[in-house]
Amino acid sequence: MVQLVTERDLRESLEAGLQETLPAGWRAQFSPTSASDDPQIDGVLDLVAPTGETSQAGVIFKARLEPAQISRELPWLTKYPTSLVVAPRMSARARSLLNDAGVSWYVPGGDYRIAIRGLFIERLVQQSKRRSAGAPDTRFVADLFAGGALRVVRWLLIEPGRSWSVGDMAERTGLTLGFVSRTLKTLARDAYIERVRGATRLTDRDALLDTWAAAPSPPQSAFERVATVDGPEALLRMIRAFTTPSPYAVTAEAAADKLAPFARFSRVEMYVQDVAGWDRALGLTTVPRGGNVVLIKPVDAGVFDGSFERDGVPLTSRPQLYVDLVRRGGAAAEAAAFMRERGALWPQ
């Protein structure tokens, strides 16, 4: 898609695009505003329904639009009953912020969501393209929810009320200062955090957690096993009794049951580094599916970050547990919602 950067190009593209997308019988006319009118908008869009009813929206053209910019400008973006923002590109995060604020948006030649009184039109087909790790622009990380960047995200969610310096986060995650700095810049760009005089604070923990849960799952190996024990609680007692030098952490329904009991669970899932060691310790038998034990060997060792004990059993961090439950869907996702509603996700 051609990147339009001038107001004139954006205006002409909007006018042409509306002619193609408006329902039959609808008409639209754009009128630019002068400096003496309202300096906060670039024009007014008049929409005429087939019934003759007219509605208006203030139009704002942006050559560049980042989520952090939207957060700063929301007070005047929502000043009018209806507003329409037009920009050559909009990230998923930018669109989400505008949707939540009730602001319509339009990407020339791409997607749009316009809700102005009796008119609602939407096109959501284009997938945002992720920048490859080798792309020239290295001010930001390519993916917040993979690799080292996810370790930063995870710690922000584990301690959402804490103020972090770059050095603090680098020490906690074991990442370089430069990589941590780029990750925090990306989070600030996407309006998840605020950075003031070297201090970083999480400002939208719910949106960050939900975006992580919706991101693709990392590649990891899950091994189905059967343990000949009398129920999952007996299995947890065996796990608790086993001494191992390598880290492990229980996740999914078995872990959620320790924090916010929701429903009976029949199997135990756990992150481990030594699969063979656990096979021997618990006398596990390999099965293709339907086991009562699942040993997950993660590619990302960050799944162990922030793990804690409950009833003598190490559990993965609360944010990691929530994401794991949501991604499993079904009853597990319901358990995640229950955990959040009960305040077990971020206890006071």
What is the predicted function of each stretch?
Residues 278-348:
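Hydrophobic alpha-helical interaction segments
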Residues 1-35:
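Acidic-basic catalytic patches of nuclease active cores, encompassing PD-(D/E)XK
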Residues 39-79, 83-86, 322:
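Conserved catalytic cores of phosphodiester-cleaving nucleases, focusing on short active-site segments
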